[in-house]
Amino acid sequence: MIILASHSPRRQELLKRIVPDFESHPASINERALPVLDPPAYVQSLATAKGQSLVPSYPGATIIAADTMVAFQGKLLGKPHDRAEAKQMITALGGQTHQVYTGLWVRLDNGSVRQQVVTTDVTFWPLSEADVESYLAEDAYQDKAGAYGIQDAGALLVKSIQGDFYNVMGLPSSTLYRMLLAEPQ
């Protein structure tokens, strides 16, 4: 049995490409209770907490947990609370390079645990006020770290990426695939 510690439609879609048969169960953790560390350490601690919270309910299962955050100039950009916050984020990212971090935590059915943080650099085009307003009108910023989804209207903001495209979507598939292999890495 494989458990994905998330109800994210994007993560489910990406995991189906690797593992066609799994169950999705969100982890119930208090993210605010965890100390905010540097971005890579923070996403790893969140993924670990999510995964570990499901171990008692699924002791013999393979559990996959992930957490993705956007960081710009050392500051974490989570999901915007409203349109105004999304506008601030997108405006700040215009013409700049930022990082997308995903912490992965995998507990295999044999009990071994694997962890990894994947980083992707994303560069946005310079954005005019009209560009930002046009993007915000799509409402594609909702429920997205950094106020954009590269698989949606946010793709029009992106000039280039360096690293794993699927990491920006929330689940670095090729890295996860290798973590799921039975052999040590």
From Swiss-Prot:
PANTHER family: BIFUNCTIONAL DTTP/UTP PYROPHOSPHATASE/METHYLTRANSFERASE PROTEIN-RELATED (PTHR43213), BIFUNCTIONAL DTTP_UTP PYROPHOSPHATASE_METHYLTRANSFERASE PROTEIN-RELATED (PTHR43213:SF5). It catalyses: dTTP + H2O = dTMP + diphosphate + H(+); UTP + H2O = UMP + diphosphate + H(+). The keyword Chaperone does not apply. Its cofactor is a divalent metal cation. Its EC number is 3.6.1.9. The keyword Hydrolase applies. Keywords: Cytoplasm, Hydrolase, Nucleotide metabolism. It is found in: Cytoplasm. HAMAP family: Maf. GO terms for biological process: nucleotide metabolic process. The active site is at D67 (proton acceptor). One of its GO terms (cellular component) is cytoplasm. GO terms for molecular function: dTTP diphosphatase activity; UTP diphosphatase activity. Belongs to the Maf family. YhdE subfamily. Nucleoside triphosphate pyrophosphatase that hydrolyzes dTTP and UTP. May have a dual role in cell division arrest and in preventing the incorporation of modified nucleotides into cellular nucleic acids. InterPro entries: ITPase-like_fam, Maf-like. This is dTTP/UTP pyrophosphatase. The record marks R10, T68, Q151 as: Important for substrate specificity. It is an enzyme of class 3 (hydrolase). Gene3D superfamilies: 3.90.950.10. It comes from the Bacteria.
